[in-house]
């Protein structure tokens, strides 16, 4: 659903190619270094926020794994939907389309902050707003620093996939 407005209003309407939303080559070493740094910052922020929430007996997000079914089939479905398709679509829309449009009208600082805010708010759960805001800023920063959407897609996909894998392993160890 997120890719349709990008294609219809952005690409088709203006006769643009997918490179205009960030599908461009990038320096692999730079992308890897910046991607690892973004991941480390994201994990640090998430851990700190989780510790703050634990003081109030709250969690950042509910366990989404049961929504995909049980067992290994549920894990595979979660990895496909939440680890590949979701991050791809979200990055194309929020960074490739929305952030790129913001950069035409706003300073880098305001475009990063507004993109992070919109990305957080769309995820609905208030206890998850701070870490998701941080992710939105970091993913937009990756696009800005590498000139390509691919590093943000890879890091986003890695974070979501790792989360599902850890939930799955955690459930198995708790049995």
Q: What role is predicted for each listed range?
A:
Residues 1-2, 72, 76, 80, ...:
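Membrane-embedded alpha-helical segments of multi-pass membrane proteins
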Residues 87-95:
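Acidic (Asp/Glu-rich) catalytic motifs at the cytosolic membrane interface
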Residues 95-106, 164-170:
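Membrane-interfacial alpha-helical segments at the cytosolic side of multi-pass membrane proteins
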Residues 1-2, 83-84, 122:
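Hydrophobic alpha-helical transmembrane segments of integral membrane proteins
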Residues 18, 95, 99, 136-140:
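Interfacial helix-capping/hinge residues at the ends of transmembrane alpha-helices
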Residues 1-14:
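Alpha-helical transmembrane segments in multi-pass membrane proteins
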Residues 15-86, 104, 173-175:
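Juxtamembrane helix-loop-helix connectors linking adjacent transmembrane helices
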């Amino acid at each position: 659903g997120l890719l349709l407005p990008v294609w219809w209003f952005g690409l088709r309407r203006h006769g643009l190619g997918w490179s205009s939303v960030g599908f461009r080559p990038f320096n692999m070493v730079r992308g890897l270094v910046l991607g690892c740094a973004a991941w480390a910052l994201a994990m640090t922020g998430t851990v700190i926020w989780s510790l703050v929430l634990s003081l109030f007996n709250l969690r950042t997000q509910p366990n989404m794994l049961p929504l995909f079914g049980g067992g290994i089939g549920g894990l595979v479905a979660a990895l496909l939907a939440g680890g590949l398709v979701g991050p791809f679509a979200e990055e194309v829309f929020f960074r490739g389309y929305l952030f790129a449009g913001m950069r035409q009208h706003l300073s880098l600082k305001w475009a990063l902050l507004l993109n992070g805010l919109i990305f957080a708010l769309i995820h609905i759960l208030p206890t998850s707003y701070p870490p998701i805001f941080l992710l939105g800023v970091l993913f937009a920063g990756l696009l800005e620093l590498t000139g390509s959407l691919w590093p943000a897609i890879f890091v986003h996909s890695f974070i979501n996939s790792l989360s599902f894998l850890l939930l799955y392993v955690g459930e198995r160890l708790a049995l």
